[in-house]
Amino acid sequence: MGKVYLVGAGPGAPDLLTLRAARILAAADIVLHDALVHPDTLKLAAHARFIDVGKRYGKVSTEQRFIHRALIEAARTHDVVVRLKGGDPMIFGRAQEELDALREAGIETEVVPGVTAALAAASTLQVSLTRRGIARTVTFLTPRVGRGETVSGTDHNSMPDVLCPPWLPAALSADTVVLYMAAGAGREIAQALIDGGKPSSTPVALVESATLPEEQRRITTLGELARATLARAEGPVVVCVGEVFRDALDELQLDSNPDAAPNELHRQVHR
């Protein structure tokens, strides 16, 4: 019987992988990886077999129960099994479900942490999520609820993926909020926060594909975001809200094109 390692691949850039993660990948016999793991990260597992078990919002995704079965089967036939997850396995990675399934099957497990998207976004923006006198609390959350998931007593079995109101109180009570899996939902998130009592002047930063060459950043306010027309995001997006981004809002010009329509957020590409 082999051992399964739940390994965090970090936010995207391969050189943000931890040394332990790189060592385990090099020894891997089989790697079950997320869709967003960088190809150069996979190259570290030079002798491994690969299985793509990725999940992407709005696209065909691997069912969780299949992932559980595949991990158990892999552990029965291989010594070193790696479940490679984007970011950190323990942040919105369904790691607990996989750990529980593996433990129930009597399989040894280990978790190797990775850099989560919220911290990658803060680093690329060069804005601390906490700041003396401004932000003492930080909340990570996702507004999305998957099919069949129950949140606060509400069964969403009939809805494939929704913006679920129970996230709002947590977002309103924190000084800084980072919303994961927010692609395509920026306007709705901004309007919900405003309706909940957040000032429309509150700074908000959107970071897509943090740490990668195609990374894109947008700095604006909740009010502007609620009215904006956003281009379709190709990569993962986090939405960061709070007064800690005030200086970034003052320093960065949202739109470099003076002839652009005022209600349109234009992409800023940083390489």
Residue map of PLM features:
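Class I S-adenosyl-L-methionine
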Residues: 1-115, 226, 232, 237
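A contiguous loop/helix-start segment that scaffolds small-molecule binding in enzyme catalytic cores
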Residues: 2-4, 76-81, 145-271
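Short hydrophobic alpha-helical segments that form membrane-spanning helices or hydrophobic packing faces
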Residues: 19, 120-122, 189-190
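Alpha-helix N-cap/helix-start and coil->helix boundary motif
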Residues: 38-39, 118, 186, 246
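Acidic/glycine-enriched edge-of-secondary-structure segments
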Residues: 49-63, 131-144, 177-178
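Short hydrophobic/aromatic-enriched beta-strand-loop microsegments
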Residues: 49-55, 108-110, 129-136, 197-206
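Class I SAM-dependent methyltransferase SAM-binding "motif I" and its flanking Rossmann-like core
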Residues: 88-174, 216-219
